[in-house]
Structures are given as C-alpha cells and as structure tokens.
C-alpha cells in the first residue's frame, strides 16, 4: 500500500519508518527537503521517498496528517484538498501542538 505522510517532524518520521519496516511504500512530505533531520531519515530509510506536501498527498492511497495542530489547515491547503478525496486519512494532529 502507498502511504503518504504529511509532516516530517518526529511523529511523521517515526510513523514512516514503522510503515517501511512493515513493507509499505512510503513518501514523507516536508516543506523543507534539505532539513537535517529529513536528510538523516532518508539515509536511514533508503526505500522511503521524500516529497512536497502536494506530491505526498497525490502519492498516498492512505494519507497520514502528522503536523502540529496550529498548521494543519495550512498543510492541507499546501497538499491540495482535492488529493484527499476518497482516501483514508489518519489524523495525528494535536490541537495544542505548534
């Protein structure tokens, strides 16, 4: 199954690694592909893909929203609301997280 994870913070990276370990195809969506943590994650998970939020939402048959609650709406807008239609969305946001 193709899983797109929107958000490259600790929650997104841990979930992406776990899904990869179960044999799933994973794309980690980030606003900053050159971020040190993201590059380290990619080195440790060479089968994982990196992309923009929009690339990730298009890629995933399942979409995991793993961003802070205060930026969730912006992340969905950047991903393109149309890419969420008829897909399973797992929302891990926390309304008090930045």
Predicted regions and their residues:
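Rossmann-like NAD(P)-binding element
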Residues: 44-48, 52-90, 94-98
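NAD(P)+-binding Rossmann beta1-loop-alpha1 motif at the extreme N-terminus of oxidoreductases
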Residues: 1-40
């Amino acid at each position: 199954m193709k899983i797109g994870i929107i958000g490259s913070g600790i929650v997104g990276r841990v979930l992406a690694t776990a899904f990869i370990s179960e044999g799933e195809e994973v794309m980690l969506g980030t606003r900053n592909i050159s971020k040190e943590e993201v590059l380290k994650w990619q080195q440790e998970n060479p089968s994982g893909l990196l992309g923009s939020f929009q690339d990730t939402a298009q890629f995933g048959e399942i979409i995991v929203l793993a961003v802070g609650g205060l930026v969730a709406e912006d992340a969905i807008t950047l991903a393109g609301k149309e890419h969420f239609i008829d897909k399973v969305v797992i929302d891990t946001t926390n309304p008090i997280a930045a």
